[in-house]
């Protein structure tokens, strides 16, 4: 079936053509096309080709611009570091700028971006703030065009030694883990990005079997399961992953049902992350350098299905685990070892609910307290706390292999890496 033609005007386009007239695919060449000269047709084809090239180039340029990042580095201050640093990173060109001080602040050991990407928040891992035995949380506005940070305000963290924080998807609530104080606190975020004092502080209870590291609770991370109000807190001191529900109207935390899950005694859960779709939870245990895998139902960890070592079988030295990240492909899980000074590479067999340790890459320095993947999963930044350097690796999505790119930079005591796409 072909489009019905009517009497034409101008250049021969059918007059008053309707969508109904052309609802089927065209099977013949319209007469107005046939009347074009060969030369004119070639000219049009040439113009179309040129336009196609220009559109492709524009699309490539936009994609390239979208893959330029400001990389923020949280640090421990007091020796060579003065606060939060920033480097410019061009992923397509694999070019890294010189680190510059983005904000001067004490012990910003972990950072988090607001969902709007206009604000950045940092813990102040302190034992005292404004004359009180408590740590701090700082709010910054990200300066457009430069990525520099402008301090908005600071608030107490609700306990000593805050070590991790996150912002919920609504952008209204910030949750912080206070390692030293054994508490988890919720702070409200104002529309202008400033922080209000804590609206909720929950104290953990209990201990476990390690004689020095598990005498009391030590919340080490806070994570909100994607797409839910479930808050997960790995507590190194109690061998539990404590589960809460965040009330997005009040900011209050209430116990989930079940209120926690446990890892093997003496493990010391430090950080955790989900597989794609929240089907599995990977818990990195600091004290034993193992990963515990939980099967989840609606993001809630329900069944411990595996605990696997992140170290080579023949390694006999001292070691603690630090960070864990899932590759965007969902095929690879990476964790860091402090002592062995490596990044462990696991293949994830989802159908079997199993992690397989397939190898290690050197971290490029000593004590890789933190590392992170860029959003595409093509590069990994390894932050080595005790050698004051960040080393960049390329990631092979097919094999999980990490290859040193030869790119690195120096920052005093780097302990957190986050990426912000340059607007």
Show which residues each predicted segment covers.
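Bacterial N-terminal signal peptides
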Residues: 42-59
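An edge-strand/N-cap motif at the start of beta-rich repeat modules
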Residues: 65-89
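Short glycine/acidic-enriched loop and turn motifs that connect beta-strands
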Residues: 77-80, 126-130, 180-182, 238-239, ...
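Beta-rich, blade/repeat-based domains predominating
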Residues: 80, 105-115, 128, 158-169, ...
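Short loop/turn segments immediately following beta-strands, especially the blade-tip
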Residues: 88-94, 140-147, 187-196, 245-252, ...
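A short beta-strand motif characteristic of beta-propeller blades
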Residues: 97-103, 151-155, 208-212, 257-262, ...
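Blade-loop segments of beta-propeller domains
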Residues: 98-167
């Amino acid at each position: 079936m072909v489009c019905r033609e009517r009497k034409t005007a101008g250049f021969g386009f059918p007059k008053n053509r309707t969508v109904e007239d052309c609802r089927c695919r065209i099977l013949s060449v319209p007469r107005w096309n046939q009347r074009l000269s060969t030369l004119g047709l070639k000219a049009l084809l040439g113009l179309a080709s040129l336009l196609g090239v220009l559109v492709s180039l524009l699309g490539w340029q936009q994609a390239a611009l979208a893959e330029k990042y400001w990389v923020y580095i949280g640090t421990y201050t007091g020796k060579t570091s003065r606060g939060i640093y920033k480097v410019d990173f061009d992923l397509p060109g694999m070019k890294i700028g010189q680190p510059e001080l983005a904000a001067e602040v004490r012990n910003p050991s972990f950072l988090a971006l607001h969902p709007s990407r206009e604000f950045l928040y940092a813990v102040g891992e302190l034992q005292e703030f404004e004359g009180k035995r408590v740590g701090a949380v700082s709010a910054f506005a990200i300066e457009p065009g430069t990525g520099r940070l402008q301090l908005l305000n600071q608030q107490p963290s609700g306990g000593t030694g805050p070590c991790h924080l996150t912002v919920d998807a609504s952008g209204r609530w910030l949750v912080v883990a206070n390692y030293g104080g054994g508490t988890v606190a919720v702070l409200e975020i104002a529309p202008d990005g400033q922080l209000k004092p804590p609206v909720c502080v929950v104290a953990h209870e209990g201990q476990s079997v390690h004689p020095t590291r598990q005498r009391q609770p030590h919340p080490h991370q806070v994570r909100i399961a994607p797409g839910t109000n479930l808050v997960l807190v790995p507590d190194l001191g109690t061998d539990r992953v404590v589960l809460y529900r965040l009330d997005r109207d009040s900011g209050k935390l209430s116990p989930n049902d079940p209120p926690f899950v446990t890892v093997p005694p003496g493990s010391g859960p430090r950080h955790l992350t989900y597989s794609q779709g929240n089907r599995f939870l990977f818990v990195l245990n600091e004290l034993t350098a193992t990963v515990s895998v939980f099967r989840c139902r609606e993001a809630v960890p329900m069944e411990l299905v595996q605990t696997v070592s992140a170290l080579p079988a023949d390694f006999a030295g001292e070691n603690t685990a630090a960070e864990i990240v899932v590759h965007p492909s969902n095929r690879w899980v990476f964790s860091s070892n402090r002592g062995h000074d490596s990044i462990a590479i696991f293949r994830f067999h989802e159908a079997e609910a199993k992690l397989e340790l397939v190898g290690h890459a050197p971290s490029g320095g000593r004590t890789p307290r933190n590392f992170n993947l860029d959003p595409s999963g093509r590069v990994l930044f390894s932050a080595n706390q005790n050698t004051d350097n960040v080393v960049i690796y390329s990631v092979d999505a097919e094999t999980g292999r990490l290859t040193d790119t030869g790119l690195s930079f120096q920052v005093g005591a780097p302990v957190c890496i986050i990426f912000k796409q340059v607007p």
